[in-house]
A protein has these predicted regions:
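Surface-exposed, charged secondary-structure patches
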Residues: 60-123
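Low-complexity, intrinsically disordered terminal/linker segments enriched in charged
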Residues: 107-111, 115, 119-126, 134, ...
């Protein structure tokens, strides 16, 4: 095999490896988000309990998990309700979701955006999750909801508060 052939094959195998890595990141991010929303499907869908710090760390990147946890502790100390009172994954306190559509876009190395669309009790809903891949796996860096005519974010709730 001559030198050009070696260089050619190295390039081909490198491109195949890069493509496999990109598709792997896409598949793992998609699986992470789909697992969340599958917990909300159907009348018996219990959703995701975010009632412990461990649960927060399982789904959110450390900085956002810490903001939510700190807010809860401060609210409890003051005898008040926490800033986040509904479920951030469905932007509601109650849900009836038959199915969901998930679109995923990689936005950079170890970053992706997931757009989830569903009807909650016949109300069309769109949730956008900013994802970050950590050594533990994919985590949510922020969630955006369309409310009235403006967009609000989970992180924004705690920055304003």
């Amino acid at each position: 095999m001559n030198r050009r052939s070696v260089v050619f094959y190295l390039g081909v195998f490198g491109a195949i490896g890069a493509l496999a890595t990109a598709n792997g990141a896409d598949a793992s991010a998609r699986s992470f988000v789909a697992a969340i929303y599958n917990a909300y499907k159907g009348r018996s869908g219990n959703g995701i309990a975010l009632d412990t710090d461990a649960a927060l760390r399982r789904y959110f990147e450390p900085g956002l998990a810490a903001l939510i946890s700190k807010d809860r502790k401060e609210a409890a100390d003051q005898g008040e309700a926490p800033t986040l009172t509904g479920d951030p994954f469905v932007d509601a306190a109650d849900w009836n979701i038959a199915d969901f559509d998930l679109a995923l876009a990689e936005t950079g190395p170890d970053k992706a955006t997931a757009t989830v669309k569903f009807d909650n009790d016949q109300k069309p809903t769109v949730i956008v999750l900013e994802l970050l891949k950590l050594k533990e796996g994919w985590r949510i860096a922020d969630i955006a909801w369309q409310r009235e005519s403006e967009t609000e974010t989970l992180r924004g709730l705690f920055v304003q508060h």
